[in-house]
Amino acid sequence: MALKQYNPVTPGMRNLVLVDRSDLYKGKPVKKLTEGLVKTGGRNNHGRVTSWWRGGGNKRRYRLIDFKRTKVDVAGRVERLEYDPNRTAFIALITYEDGEQTYILAPQRLQVGDAVISADRADIKPGNAMPLKNMPVGTIIHNVEMKPGKGGQLARSAGCYAQLIGKDAGYAQLRLSSGELRLVRGECLATVGAVSNPDNQNEKLGKAGRSRWMGRRPHVRGVVMNPVDHPHGGGEGRTSGGRHPVTPWGKPTKGKRTRSNKKTDSLIMRSRHLAKKKR
């Protein structure tokens, strides 16, 4: 979908660039495929802020997305494409031959009326899901499982995709958008195609209020806080923080690698931090 630019009839519209969503369905979602969504304001069950700069925003209903694609060997048809306020990608409403309906992530080039299926072997068409071991090398995929049956976890944001670059000893070799090369079990499911809405990264909100509508609050720097709030806080006048950049809890930030899952290190063939390690 194209980008929309606006005439600067107000200051907030001067730099406004939005994705044109005129082709999407304009009604409400299927009620049985949604559930209520309670706002947390970034607080956990103790009431403490664990995710800063969140709160407010328009009321939403959560759309239940089928990341597992467990409806095997039953053909479905794309009923409509919809906007989902809970994610950057668009979603597609699928109606199966037996009458059941589900939402899936909409890949690029998926059109209303297209047929999709989840099967052990299927055509290499956007929206079809199958195990990685049965896909040809070079296929562009998204919504990739990391454990068989767990549901897709990799390449789910707008415009994202992974590429199958090889198969060996029961594992599939994937190249991710980050540059990482990793192994995934061949039995894991993936969906053909790249995720929809690739122009999401080119959007410009134009004004702070549009960010607030999305539930994002102002991102305050640590150096302008008080010492009680942040290690960089305090000082008379403007200061630089006086130490290497750290998080509010004193851990190094700006590039410090924190990965500690040694069990799966053997599945990462090339780290996405390769250039950083050479420094």
UniProtKB/Swiss-Prot annotation:
Membrane-crossing segments per the record: none
Basic residues biased stretches: 270-279
Gene Ontology annotations of biological process type: cytoplasmic translation
UniProt GO molecular function: rRNA binding; structural constituent of ribosome; transferase activity
Region (Disordered): 223-279
Annotated GO CC locations: large ribosomal subunit
Keywords, alphabetical: Ribonucleoprotein, Ribosomal protein, RNA-binding, rRNA-binding
Keyword Membrane recorded: no
Domain of life: Bacteria
Family annotation (InterPro entries): NA-bd_OB-fold, Rib_uL2_dom2, Ribosomal_uL2, Ribosomal_uL2_bac/org-type, Ribosomal_uL2_C, Ribosomal_uL2_CS, Ribosomal_uL2_dom3, Ribosomal_uL2_RNA-bd_dom
PROSITE patterns: RIBOSOMAL_L2
Quaternary structure (record): Part of the 50S ribosomal subunit. Forms a bridge to the 30S subunit in the 70S ribosome.
Task performed by this protein: One of the primary rRNA binding proteins. Required for association of the 30S and 50S subunits to form the 70S ribosome, for tRNA binding and peptide bond formation. It has been suggested to have peptidyltransferase activity; this is somewhat controversial. Makes several contacts with the 16S rRNA in the 70S ribosome.
HAMAP family: Ribosomal_uL2_B (MF_01320_B)
Family: Belongs to the universal ribosomal protein uL2 family.
Protein name per its UniProtKB record: Large ribosomal subunit protein uL2
Organism lineage: Bacteria, Pseudomonadati, Pseudomonadota, Alphaproteobacteria, Rhodospirillales
